[in-house]
Amino acid sequence: MDNYTWHSGTLIPSDSPSSIDRSQLYLEILGVLSVVYLLQTLVAYSKSFKAPFVGFRFWYEPKWLVGLRFSQGALAQVNEGYAKYKNAMFKVARNDSDILVIPNKYVEELRSLPDEKISAIRAHIKNLLGKYSTTLILLESDLHTRMLQTKLTPNLGSFIEVIESELLFAMDQEIPANLDDWQSVNVFHIVLRIVARISARVFLGVPACRNEEWLQTSIHYTENVFATVMLLRRFPKWMHPIVGHLLPSYWAIHRNLRTAKRIISPMVRQRRAEEAKRNPDYVKPNDLLQWMMDGANENDGQPDKLAHRQLLLSLASIHTTTMAAAHCFYDLCQHPEYFEPLREEINDVIAQDGGWKKTTLNKMRKLDSFLKESQRINPPSLLAFNRIVSEDLTLSDGTLLPKGTHFSMPSAAILQDNGVEPGADQFDGFRYYKKRLNPEEANKHQFAMTDNNNLHFGHGKYSCPGRFFASNEIKIIMAHLLTDYEFKYPRGATRPRNLTADENLYPDPSARLLMRRRVVAPPQASITPQLVSA
């Protein structure tokens, strides 16, 4: 029987000249695309820094296959590279980019270099596939990071009461009421909602921080960006314009942005209208949005652009803070011997201070140590200090990094190296507390601090500008939840395994803990004490 195919509404033999011509054309197109791809790869390789790749199982294995394995096996690949080339450079093949991993012996000479030489912003945008995640606005200015550094961080002490006030409101809204006995809860989700509320209170003020549509938008924007980036990385760059527009998460990002503009842009216009009246009784709101309005130039100060930057702040703050806090709760339940010492410290410090004061959190050294150890074991990323070389760069030892090189440092492997941290393979919640008992190191080893070994927040000029705010958020949340509630794993359960996506690590958001109200009330000296039911 003859074989037939459908062509222009007619069944024709599949071996007819028309079918053969089309097959030949498809093969020729495929051949041309393959040659173009090969040439692009060879040209890119010829311009790149020569360093050994890790992750290859055999020398002729296609790089895209190694990159595909990197998506779920990055930990093994980075650790392999660190073990083989601890004080040298090596490469990992991520599907969208080869990343040069360099040792932290270069930190000091790189940490203060300007964007004109190595760019943290361009690396950040590249990691987020800026064209598809609405993050290209970061190239226009550093407005929001500048306001975090110059306005929020220096005034964090004055926001302690604001944060605690919003926390108590959020706990009332987000924590189940029937917790007199053990109940199964999703702690990740509870903390996520609390962090979103507190962040909105500091970034936007009242009543915007209570706007449910904004809370949902600020939470889902990050999830949509992450989904879009992870999916697009599985495809070659030339397919991104096609695949990107087919992803539901891509269109959800743009819906999130439209919603942000609809909610925040009128707030900006209303505030400016009030300022224009020159009413002596008008008091400017004390929040990040107002600081951005006051510090913006004509371009940055457009209402829609301010709204856009507020959305980017949620991308940088809500989920990262939530993940760090969730890791802490998972680690506490795995190591329950730390519950009581932490509660004792929290209660003692608050009692000594007569409530929450500007310096209260600084005195909770055991809590700070536990956060830092939890992050050491469960880092947000295997790689940190991400940069793209803006122009050919010669390092102090003569090493030449060509323009366009994407490099980072193996931040997780460094802190899990016994040569850097003795006993690194063991969880020691008070590791850094004990180090600070030495008077010469009393002000070192803090959660939000960075140094040549501790790179999770970056280091130098482009360290995370919101890390001190995030640290305060987590500590206040944990202080209240630990003194008000008890937590444990369900019978037979242990700490959930961390999830991975390329170099990113994150706690299992579906994990459940048992939670119940404590029968001992927190100290009555608290500014707004939360009474605990018997």
From Swiss-Prot:
It is an enzyme of class 1 (oxidoreductase). The keyword Transmembrane helix applies. It is found in: Membrane. The chain crosses the membrane at residues 25-45. Pathway: Secondary metabolite biosynthesis; terpenoid biosynthesis. Its cofactor is heme. Bifunctional terpene synthase; part of the gene cluster that mediates the biosynthesis of the diterpene ent-pimara-8(14),15-diene (PD). Within the cluster, the HMG-CoA reductase AN1593 functions in the mevalonate pathway, which produces isoprenoid precursors. The geranylgeranyl pyrophosphate (GGPP) synthase AN1592 is needed in the formation of GGPP, the precursor for diterpenes. Lastly, the pimaradiene synthase pbcA performs the 2 cyclization steps that convert GGPP to ent-pimara-8(14),15-diene. This is Cytochrome P450 monooxygenase AN1598.
